[in-house]
């Protein structure tokens, strides 16, 4: 009787459970084209921008758009509101162009 079960036991011991490997993935909340479009819209609609056609992904706030540092802070705050995130002051100080804002948003997984 034991021999009858021994063949089944060998089969059962040969079967190993399948454990899926964890593969880390990085998910971005906002795709770059969507982030670019939304940021361009936010910056273009800012009151102190006199020519919205000058707003491009390569525009700098101070040189190309004529914004002072307080205006740049207001633009960053508008971007925070648009994407429902809080940008730390240290990071906000480094956002000096539309391109910087786009890069920051696409790298931030909390952006919506």
Swiss-Prot record:
The name under which this protein is listed is Putative acyl carrier protein, mitochondrial
**Entry similarity comment:** Belongs to the acyl carrier protein (ACP) family.
GO terms, molecular function: acyl binding; acyl carrier activity
Q: What does this protein do?
A: Carrier of the growing fatty acid chain in fatty acid biosynthesis. May be involved in the synthesis of very-long-chain fatty acids.
Report the record's disulfide bonds.
Answer: none
Q: Where's it found, cell-wise? A: Mitochondrion
Q: According to its UniProt record, how is this protein modified after translation? A: 4'-phosphopantetheine is transferred from CoA to a specific serine of apo-ACP by acpS. This modification is essential for activity because fatty acids are bound in thioester linkage to the sulfhydryl of the prosthetic group.
* PTM-bearing positions, type O-(pantetheine 4'-phosphoryl)serine: 69
Q: In which pathway does it act?
A: Lipid metabolism; fatty acid biosynthesis
List the Pfam families.
PP-binding
HAMAP family assigned: Acyl_carrier
Query: To which species is this protein native?
Result: Schizosaccharomyces pombe (strain 972 / ATCC 24843) (Fission yeast)
Cross-referenced NCBIfam families: acyl_carrier, PRK00982.1-2
Query: Has UniProt tagged this entry with the keyword Lipid biosynthesis?
Result: yes
């Amino acid at each position: 009787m034991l021999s009858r079960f021994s063949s089944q036991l060998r089969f059962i011991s040969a079967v190993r459970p399948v454990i899926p490997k964890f593969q880390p993935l990085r998910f971005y909340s906002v795709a770059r084209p969507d982030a670019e479009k939304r940021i361009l819209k936010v910056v273009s609609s800012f009151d102190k921008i006199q020519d919205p056609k000058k707003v491009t992904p390569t525009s700098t706030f101070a040189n190309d758009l004529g914004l002072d540092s307080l205006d740049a802070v207001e633009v960053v705050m508008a971007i925070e509101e648009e994407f429902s995130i809080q940008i730390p002051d240290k990071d906000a100080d480094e956002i000096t162009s539309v391109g910087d804002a786009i890069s920051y948003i696409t790298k931030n997984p909390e952006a919506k």
